[in-house]
Amino acid sequence: MTLKDLRIGESAKITAVGGEGALRQHFLDMGVVPGAEIKLMKLAPMGDPMEFRIHGYELTLRLADAEKIEADPIACETVCPKPAADAGKSGEKQEDQDRRGRKKEARAAAKSHHPGLGEGGIYHVKTDGKPLPEGTTLTFALAGNQNCGKTTLFNQLTGANQHVGNFPGVTVDRKDGVIRGHDNTLVTDLPGIYSMSPYTSEEIVTRQFLLDDKPKGIINIVDATNIERNLYLTMQLMELDIPMVLALNMMDEVRENGGTIRVNEMEEALGIPVIPISAAKNEGISELIDHAIHVAQYQEKPGRADFCDPQDHNGAVHRCLHGIMHLIEDHAAKAGIPVRFAASKLAEGDQMILQQLELEENEKEMLRHIICQMEEERGMDQAAAIADMRFAFIQQICGATVVKPHESKEHARSVKIDQILTGKYTAIPAFVGIMGLVFWLTFGVIGAWLSGLLDMGISALTELTDAGLTAYGINPVVHSLIINGIFEGVGSVLSFLPIIVTLFFFLSILEDSGYMARVAFVMDKLLRKIGLSGRSIVPMLIGFGCTVPGVMASRTLPSERDRKMTILLTPFMSCSAKLPIYGFFSAAFFPGKSALVMIILYFTGILVGILFALIARGAVFKGEPVPFVMELPNYRMPGAKNVGQLLWEKAKDFLERAFTVIFLATIVIWCLQTFDTRLNVVTDSQDSLLAMLAGVIAPVFAPLGFGDWRISTALITGFMAKESVVATLTVLTEGISITSLLTPLSAAALLVFCLLYTPCVAAITSIKRELGGKWAALVVVMQCVIAWLCAFAVYTIGGLL
């Protein structure tokens, strides 16, 4: 049978893993290995994909992928033996005894003292040794799985001392920061990954950074509540032979659930410092920093890199790895790749490492012979054998050092919440309700109220400044520039800052809580109908906040096809920068119905995006989306510090644009509107330079009902930044009501055009970095054409009604 044949609640033992290439390796890296026990938890509301529990965590697979994995069913008696008729009470007593035993063992382990610096041991202060030269910058790589608290730890380590950039040659985000109180350090926050296999761009970037940049130390953060899954990456990092510390995050949750980890024993077994921490509560951070700096300063490398049992299957894997190490030792040294890491990667079939080593043909033949012999003795193919070796070691370590609770409160809570949020009949209504609530609170309650308060403050400041300049008797031209150009232009945009921050606040909560992963699970089958994976929903939802991070979020998609298609769809998701446009026109033409107008616009963008995807799938992006293999983390309350820092970054970015791009745009527009070709001040704006330039393209918009040159000018400046549309119109319509330029129908057509036409320069630049100049140019032309056609349809059909 295959995993596809399992029913909900049934368990099985995996016997064979199908598939090929990088996908199959990804299955193995996620713990889907022969011999592993797996249980079907549920199906998505539409019947596909499936949610399994394996190695203590939830994993999603599509039916088509589950069909590639063979398994033997585990009888119910094996999984949950039925108690005898008279054994009910004794069974309850036994469960109570087990629970008390776990708590007693946890208390005993919690009392075990973890030695700090200066208390002896290889990882502690010593008087001898050869430390790095004084003044050397201690560079660290912060590595870990997704959803393990890595961002929280990075913020705790560095505070505000962060710099955001990109890794060389690629578009994956890179964050660097200096550890607080240690100016000679530099921490690089690597992307969250599950293994060092080249499946996603993040994994490739992480591997190349560690191999090429060779940091002085690695801080490996793991989720202590899901330690079996996380230690798989730890083992591969240890093979790099770089000084390393292991940060056991969320230890507070482990203790609260009656479990523990015997840190000292794990430290001894792994041969690296193991530090229990809680990044969210700032517990154990100072000890982690002390140990990290110490191992980096003294270059104390992991004391263990050999994880295979010499007795397992007559040492088949052990002999294979050591044979490969002996074969490639010189080549690995020449290529600058740690020999143990290179050997294990060759053993599992990593072609990128094979190319880097530049082996001779006879050496390649010998390598194939060594691997074939191992496969024959082990009874598994090479990739499965190496993955099995790693998980066998992890089970051995965890069995000796980890006291697990029967079920964590976080997991039990997540199961209950998922009954509604991923339930067969409740998931989609819940999603619509949650997103509707977010938009309602943002546009109709919290954001709108705060925006009104800020607008009142800006208006008061404008009046005060106006009165002061008038009393001072400043030159009328300068007076007009300051009040009509800068204050009214920039101020009209600034008043929408609360709405934008409010939207990002809710989106960050949905993402950090773990709900976005559930949305991907729920929507996968629906998105497959338009040629996308469920993972694509996350970048598109982020696109509601801003197209730039939405485009960047597509980097996590393993398929180039899915990534391109998702990037092209993201601009159809109305970004928060367009909110000032919607608010400005809906307040003028549809008073009292602003929230309804905005919601209609958002759903219009989604609908047009779906239609575009269906056409693109049949014409350009033929084929099927990549497999849906994803971990579903437990629900967690987002950290206030992380959310606050994100909001500050978004607010700062908005303010920087308001006082740079928009500020300059308003000044340029004011100058063009104020002067004629001879630089004389005009009394009628229709005689201005701006009117002359905008008049050239105004006829293009005449069939849409907004052929006025002032509207055309505003749309052009909107290409710089969407917020500039309102700022420009505010400057150009001084003393004129916007209702005199447009009718409600033409305003509706204009809103649709603004919804769909080309994204701002920042978004186009981001698309260019991701896909190249041709695709970026295509997006500009394509979005303008689609926007024109849709606006024309609205204006024409509306005129017939």
Residue ranges and their predicted role:
Residues 245, 255-406:
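Alpha-helical transmembrane helix bundles of large polytopic membrane transport and channel proteins
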Residues 377, 384-385, 404, 445-486, ...:
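Extended, low-charge hydrophobic alpha-helical regions
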Residues 421-521:
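Core alpha-helical transmembrane segments of integral membrane proteins
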Residues 430-441, 503-508, 586-588, 601-616, ...:
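Hydrophobic core segments of alpha-helical transmembrane domains in multi-pass membrane transport
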Residues 456, 460-464, 517-547, 622-646, ...:
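Juxtamembrane inter-helical linkers in multi-pass membrane proteins
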Residues 576-599, 762-772, 793-801:
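Transmembrane helix-loop junctions at the membrane interface of multipass transporters and ion channels
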